[in-house]
A protein has these predicted regions:
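Acetyl-CoA-dependent GNAT
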Residues: 5, 9-83, 89-102, 136, ...
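Residues at secondary-structure transition points
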Residues: 35, 86, 114, 141-142, ...
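Short amphipathic helical patch at the helix-1/turn junction of helix-turn-helix
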Residues: 78, 113-114
Length: 166
């Protein structure tokens, strides 16, 4: 794929680009603020990856809770002008690889609008399954619906990982 960018850990220098992409995807009133992204970026129990080629084109944020066996995808955003290039797929795969490295994490979950057919197709193709419907999850109209599906994926251990416990 000649259009592949570099996927890397996000840093504070990416805040403006991340915030701008969020605004492009969700509009002013529905977006996370720069302050919220700064918190998510620097929070000890989170992962933020960006995909970059001539600037940041997309990002994913995954949250971890101490002692929990489930990681949560908080958001996966790709610039509307860059969609259809596999950026979301690559970000999702990279995030899953990072999550597999966390001891005790066995599953990854997310919520997605019941009306967001593109995202639903992406997640289904990646092996996520719907486990429930959350009514009025968003509290506002999001892709033509206020409801969300909860989706989960069971994660296999990282390649070469043994089952021996110390």
């Amino acid at each position: 794929m000649g259009d592949d960018g570099v996927i890397r850990q996000a840093n504070r220098d990416d805040l403006d680009a991340i915030t701008a992409i969020e605004m492009e995807c969700f509009g002013d009133s529905l977006s996370y603020s720069r302050k919220q992204f700064r918190y998510l970026l620097t929070k000890a129990h989170s992962l933020c990856l960006v995909e970059e080629k001539d600037g940041v084109r997309g990002f994913i944020i995954v949250l971890f809770r101490h002692g929990d066996s489930v990681a949560a995808i908080e958001t996966l955003d790709v610039r509307p002008s860059e969609r259809g290039k596999g950026i979301g797929v690559r970000l999702l795969q990279a995030a899953e690889e990072h999550v597999r490295q966390h001891p005790g994490i066995r599953r990854i979950r997310l919520e997605v609008s019941t009306g967001n057919e593109t995202a639903l197709a992406l997640y289904r193709k990646a092996g996520y399954r719907v486990t429930g419907r959350l009514e009025d999850f968003y509290g506002y109209d999001h892709h033509g619906s206020r409801d969300a599906y909860r989706m989960v994926k069971d994660l296999a251990a990282p390649s070469g990982a043994g089952t021996h416990s110390p």
